[in-house]
């Protein structure tokens, strides 16, 4: 059984500003040398960041953006995140320059004053020192101040946590597969696309649906994931390797790590030699600099706090609010309405990739607390429901408490919606993900523990991608009788990326919500892993552009992040570590799959965690195997126990409020925020209409009377 990590060393040093004075005697790189190197690098990196922003605006205005450029719109770092990533880039490039231009033999040479370098780069700049109000009953938007001993713990724009040390080809930053002749554990790593082609792909969509899980089960997983983590791509740091060279000519270098197509790949005929791939944004190392290996950023808060609704940066949080109203409302769309109900506001910053999808309709992307909200139509639908629920709560609270001002109403509604997401996730979602392993990894709540590290781990960002196996090839829209809606009731998934016009001008969200309730998720199958809609047509909303391969991207991203291999994580979780084909067959209970993996990777040690974890047979009553159950369960337990504002923690809500909150349900959310009147009681389970559906009048409502107060 895993025991909570104690953090005395980490808590003493996690904040970017708590830098220890250097005790070096001889400094090969003097302060002047460091300053000169950093100044030169800043000019180079700043230009690269500016060029990238300019290029993105130009290409999206061209009426013919590429798949990469559409993707980049959502992966583009903004605000404080952009500053943090830029500083990380300057740090790394400065180290390279100092190593090249001075007598240093390696970048961890004790004679290099890393403290001086940190300050010269400006590594403290992205996150100004926060003055915490210890008596505030509300979370900060940034996630700071949750842990009183270490206020930055779990905050946005910090490094993802490492549960095992990073494994890079050069020990610092280069991913395995970067240098052709270099090996990992004695073997060359296979091309990511080759693994996707031989292991992940399938042709026949028959029999792939999950007879026990609704499509909403898949969609809730993406909502939770976007609440917890986001690692935007970085920019290219040198002038030698422009994005054009990476995207059009597959020239590897700097932060360009193209996904090369293997021989006989059908994409060779239409897409050239590769899919472009840009490495994830990373941050400066933190004192005491025990490791200088590249650490990827988490741009959002690590807490399950509805940050995807409210944002993780103060400037965005403010932009999302209706500050002209004293009701504590979120801003809504002023140009279009869903039969009297609100839509998300448009992100009116031009250009918008969503307008390119249908140049006649010209509907922009939506604006939400997470920039990925318009990535696909069901995600935008779920965001819309959460936005409406905030405003419903705020209005109801105003009726109960006419004396509350807009700020109080906003914060209380935000607090309740955060609790809603926590309850739905832990009560309804995780038990049918982890199945028989639920109690092992997430025992009953014992209260807040300030020694538990709530940060999202790097490996979790891959473990949680099991949801990609649950995405079906089509999305259905249903009418009030749960029958096909209109002439285009069933749409291919790839036509719904960046597709906001289908919501605004073609039926609203109700037909899509009914599809989420009455249609099924895809079932992960060892020989039918990821639909071709994601494996060949990702971000291909029109026939004018080519699609990406999400599976290959996941595998390449494992290497980009320096992920240890399959057996390292099996050992971490106390599971057996197969060394041979026979051993792998025993673990996977599948001789054919084990042989395919061994033919590609040569050793189980090298299998990328994303494919290795997903290849395992599912645990009883769950939808992941033993390894992913361990990684997911451990992470969610830490998210819960390391959160001072967790809804069950005494003092966060009153006892009566907690009793009331236990009655929330996703079905009630739908009843309260759509025109739908028939819903299933168990929204994540597969449901057949009308047998499994009830009238909204029979679904418990959230009783807000415990929130009535005489206090302001």
Swiss-Prot record:
Disulfide bonds join 123-284, 132-145, 246-256, 250-274, 354-365, 573-630, 671-696. The keyword Oxidoreductase applies. Residues 1-22 form the signal peptide. Its EC number is 1.11.1.7. Mammary gland; milk. The modification 3'-nitrotyrosine is found at residue 482. GO terms for cellular component: basolateral plasma membrane; cytoplasm; extracellular space. The keyword Nucleus does not apply. Thiocyanate (SCN(-)) and hypothiocyanite (OSCN(-)) are bound in the distal heme cavity. The iodide ion (I(-)) occupies a position which is stabilized by the interactions with heme moiety, His-226, Arg-372 and Glu-375. Hydrogen peroxide is held between the heme iron and His-226. Belongs to the peroxidase family. XPO subfamily. Heme-containing oxidoreductase which catalyzes the conversion of thiocyanate (SCN(-)) into antimicrobial agent hypothiocyanous acid (OSCN(-)) in the presence of hydrogen peroxide (H2O2). Also involved in the conversion of iodide (I(-)) into hypoiodite (IO(-)) in the presence of H2O2. Responsible for the inactivation of a wide range of micro-organisms and hence, important component of defense mechanism. The lactoperoxidase-SCN(-)-H2O2 system shows antibacterial properties against some streptococci strains. The lactoperoxidase-I(-)-H2O2 system shows antibacterial properties against E.coli. This is Lactoperoxidase. It comes from Bos taurus. The lineage of its organism: Eukaryota, Metazoa, Chordata, Craniata, Vertebrata.
């Amino acid at each position: 059984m895993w025991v909570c990590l104690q953090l005395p060393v980490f808590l003493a040093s996690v904040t970017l500003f708590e830098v220890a004075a250097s005790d070096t005697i001889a400094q090969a790189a003097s302060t002047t040398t460091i300053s000169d190197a950093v100044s030169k690098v800043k000019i180079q990196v700043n230009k690269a960041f500016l060029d990238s922003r300019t290029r993105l605006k130009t290409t999206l205005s061209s009426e013919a953006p590429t798949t990469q450029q559409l993707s980049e719109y959502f992966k583009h770092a903004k605000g404080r995140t952009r500053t943090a990533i830029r500083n990380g880039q300057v740090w790394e490039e400065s180290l390279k320059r100092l190593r090249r231009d001075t007598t240093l033999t390696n970048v961890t040479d004790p004679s290099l004053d890393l403290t001086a370098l940190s300050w010269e780069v400006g590594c403290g700049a992205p996150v100004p020192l926060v003055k915490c109000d210890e008596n505030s009953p509300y979370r900060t938007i940034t996630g700071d101040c949750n842990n009183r001993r270490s206020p930055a713990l779990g905050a946005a724009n910090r490094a993802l946590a490492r549960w095992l040390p990073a494994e890079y080809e050069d020990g610092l930053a280069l991913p395995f597969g970067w240098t052709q002749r270099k090996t990992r554990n004695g073997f060359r790593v296979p091309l990511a696309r080759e693994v996707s082609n031989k292991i992940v792909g399938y042709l026949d969509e028959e029999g792939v649906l999950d007879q026990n899980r609704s499509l909403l089960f898949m969609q809730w997983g993406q909502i939770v994931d976007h609440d917890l983590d986001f690692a935007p791509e970085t920019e290219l740091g040198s002038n030698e390797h422009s994005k054009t060279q990476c995207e059009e000519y597959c020239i590897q270098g700097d932060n360009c790590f193209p996904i090369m197509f293997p021989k006989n790949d059908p994409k060779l005929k239409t897409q050239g030699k590769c899919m472009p791939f840009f490495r994830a944004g990373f941050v400066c190392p933190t004192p005491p600099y025990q490791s200088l290996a590249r650490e990827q950023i988490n741009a959002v808060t690590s807490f399950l706090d509805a940050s995807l609704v409210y944002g993780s940066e103060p400037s965005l949080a403010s932009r999302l609010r209706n500050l002209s109203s004293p009701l504590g409302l979120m801003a809504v769309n002023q140009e279009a309405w869903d039969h009297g109900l609100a839509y998300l506001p448009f992100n009116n910053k031009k250009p918008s990739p969503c307008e390119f999808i249908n140049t006649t309709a010209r509907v922009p992307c939506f604006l939400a607390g997470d920039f990925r909200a318009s990535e696909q139509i069901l995600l935008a639908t779920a965001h819309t429901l959460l936005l409406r629920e905030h405003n419903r709560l705020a209005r109801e609270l105003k009726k109960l408490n006419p004396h509350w001002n807009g700020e109080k109403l906003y914060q209380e509604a935000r607090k309740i919606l955060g609790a809603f997401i926590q309850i739905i996730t832990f009560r309804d979602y995780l038990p049918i993900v982890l199945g028989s392993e639920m109690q092992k990894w997430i025992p009953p709540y014992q209260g807040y523990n300030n020694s538990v590290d709530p940060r999202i781990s790097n490996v979790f960002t891959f473990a949680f991608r099991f949801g990609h196996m649950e995405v079906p090839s089509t999305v259905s829209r249903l009418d009030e009788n749960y029958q096909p809606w209109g002439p285009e009731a069933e749409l291919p998934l790839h036509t719904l990326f960046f597709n906001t016009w289908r919501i605004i001008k073609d039926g609203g969200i109700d037909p899509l919500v009914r599809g989420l309730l009455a249609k099924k998720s895809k079932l992960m199958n060892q020989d039918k892993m990821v639909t071709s809609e994601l494996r060949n047509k990702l971000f291909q909303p029109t026939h004018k552009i080519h699609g990406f391969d999400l599976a290959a991207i996941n595998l390449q991203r494992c290497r980009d992040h320096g992920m240890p291999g399959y057996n390292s994580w099996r050992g971490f979780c106390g599971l057996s570590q197969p060394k041979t084909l026979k051993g792998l067959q025993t673990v996977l209970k599948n001789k054919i799959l084990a042989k395919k993996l061994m033919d590609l990777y040569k050793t189980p040690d090298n299998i990328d965690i994303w494919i290795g974890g997903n290849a395992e047979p599912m645990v009883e009553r769950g939808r992941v195997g033993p390894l992913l159950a361990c990684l997911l369960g451990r992470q969610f337990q830490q998210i819960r126990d390391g959160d001072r504002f967790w809804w069950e923690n005494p003092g966060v809500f009153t006892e009566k409020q907690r009793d009331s909150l236990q009655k929330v349900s996703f079905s009630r959310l739908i009843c309260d925020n759509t025109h739908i009147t028939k819903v299933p009681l168990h929204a994540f389970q597969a449901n057949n209409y009308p047998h499994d559906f009830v009238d909204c009048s029979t679904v418990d409502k959230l009783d807000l009377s415990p929130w009535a107060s005489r206090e302001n």
